[in-house]
């Protein structure tokens, strides 16, 4: 398939318009693949389209698409991108998630520690693909002293993400510390809203600002030291 223009399908359970990580990743990967000349279609399921290659995000929730594509096209490449939910919740207890990994030609993980959650027999077909971001322009004079050391946490408030871990760690810092935590991301439940508000009440170092547009998230990231 080298130097060929491929018809590539990307399956993600996240619906169009969603700000969830899987949809954002699908859009970014599609943009990169199109820039290389390939034709890319993003869907929530696989309905028998004649793709040369299928990329499925989420081993468990995309299992039906993975199984059908493998059955209909046993010789075509099938890539399964493992999400954090796959690695740290679903794989230990879901036979379907584990079956998706066996059906894949290649597995993608986003960080090397993910290998620790995978059976050793799958390591050979697993690759780390680091997420990237466009360079930021310099927005501050580096000679101007920084009043606080700002650490930003970017991610939706979901229990599986352990979203308040940074805030809890910040509580242990000495009074002289200048560390401040700013948390960007939507709350998936009212319980998470209440937890975030409670954390702000008891922890002056922590501030949750909810879901923000992409330009604003990038701006916060640029202005953070960590």
Task: Describe the residue ranges of each PLM region.
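Acidic donor-binding loop of glycosyltransferase active sites
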Residues: 222-226
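Nucleotide-activated donor-binding/catalytic signature segment of Leloir-type glycosyltransferases, i.e.
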Residues: 185, 193-216
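Donor nucleotide-sugar binding/catalytic pocket of nucleotide-sugar-dependent glycosyltransferases
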Residues: 102-139
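Active-site proximal beta-strand in glycosyltransferases
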Residues: 53-55, 69-88, 106-109, 126-127
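A short, basic/aromatic alpha-helical/loop segment that forms part
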Residues: 158-163, 174-176, 189-191, 211
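Acidic anion/phosphate-binding donor-loop and adjacent secondary structure
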Residues: 90-92, 132-148
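A conserved, positively charged/aromatic
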Residues: 87-105
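Conserved donor-binding/catalytic core segment of Leloir-type glycosyltransferases
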Residues: 145-161, 167-173, 181-184
């Amino acid at each position: 398939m080298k130097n060929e223009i491929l018809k590539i399908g990307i399956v993600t359970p996240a619906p169009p318009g969603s700000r969830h990580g899987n949809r954002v990743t699908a859009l970014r990967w599609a943009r990169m693949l199109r820039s290389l000349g390939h034709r890319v279609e993003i869907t929530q399921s696989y309905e028998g389209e004649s793709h040369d290659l299928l990329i499925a995000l989420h081993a468990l929730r995309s299992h039906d698409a993975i199984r059908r594509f493998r059955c209909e096209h046993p010789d075509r490449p099938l890539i399964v991108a493992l999400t954090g939910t796959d690695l740290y919740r679903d794989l230990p207890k879901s036979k379907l998630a584990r079956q998706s990994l066996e059906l894949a030609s290649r597995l993608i993980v986003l960080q090397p520690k993910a290998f620790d959650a995978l059976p050793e027999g799958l390591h050979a077909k697993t690759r780390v693909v680091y997420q990237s971001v466009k360079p930021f322009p310099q927005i501050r004079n580096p000679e101007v002293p920084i009043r606080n050391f700002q650490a930003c946490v970017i991610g939706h408030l979901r229990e599986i993400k352990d979203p308040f871990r940074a805030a809890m760690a910040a509580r242990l810092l000495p009074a002289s510390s200048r560390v401040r935590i700013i948390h960007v991301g939507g709350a998936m439940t009212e319980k998470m809203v209440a937890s975030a508000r409670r954390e702000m009440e008891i922890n002056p170092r922590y501030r949750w600002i909810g879901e923000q547009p992409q330009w604003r998230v990038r701006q916060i990231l640029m202005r953070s030291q960590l």
